[in-house]
């Protein structure tokens, strides 16, 4: 994880302000180059109410920031990858489903997917 990502996402986890070269947070929202890529309901520290998006920019940097957030929030078994110019949500390195570059995904949805994957022998793989 890049130092900038670690700094910003650790502050976001704690609900604190932080700024770096390309990314900043007010503790409730994370912006990359001015685009909102993560948000939590104000004054709420329930991880299920945290949401993230590629904000229309499926770049290496956007995916790295999102994956860093997932790691800091304890969701390191999930990630967002690109394959053949398509974005995918992965669980333990396996594609779960495609992701639209403007789609908003919540950590609550990841909790649900994790439970489904653990409780089912059928895979949800794309």
Predicted regions: what is each one?
Residues 1-126:
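Terminal leader/tail segments of proteins
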